[in-house]
Amino acid sequence: QLQQDVQNDDRKQELLRLAGKYNVYIVEDDIAADFDTNSRNDPLFYYDSSDKVIYIKSFSKVLMPGLRVCALILPDLIKNTFLEYKEWTDTYTSILSQGSLAVYLGSGMFDKYQDSIRRLYMNRMGVLQETVRENPAPGLEWNIPDSGFFACVKLKKDTPFDKIQPMLFKNNIRLMDTSKFFLKEFRNNHYYRVSVSKANEDEIRAGIPKLIRILGRYN
């Protein structure tokens, strides 16, 4: 599964080459497209000339998780098989949700909302970048995008999540154990994901210095 906004063009081309070589499909879950500030950052599907990409565009992040509606582009070879399975596993797709979304998209309201939500998260990430610059810490390597929900901080030392979790909770900081994101044979404890989805700009300014100090103790 590939979140497209973390991949550069060369990486995309290499992934497509490997998909063709080994005759496998790539599922591209384009959940962050609505937050992307780079209009030239095309999805992997854009480069696919061999029908190896299954492209999914969800509205759960930009609108609401409970909407449960997405757009899907499938390679011709597996369309009929997919529709057959969908018929038996998803017999009650909400007509109301689909109709409401269609009206919302067609009216132009979504475009206005998309612009406002993109600015909101651009501002939050900008504050995060600024706060990190103002609180330098040796051994911490940050990857902060220009917009979106998530940033990443890497520690030099392998630091199990359960080791720092009590101190995080004590300071009202909630992080996810990102070791679960890795295949078992590649699992490590160097990376921590930071989300700004539920934190406003003031909370980011107050919380990030605390996080940096805590991580610094274990690094």
Q: What are these regions, as identified by a protein language model?
A:
Residues 1-219:
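PLP-dependent class I/II
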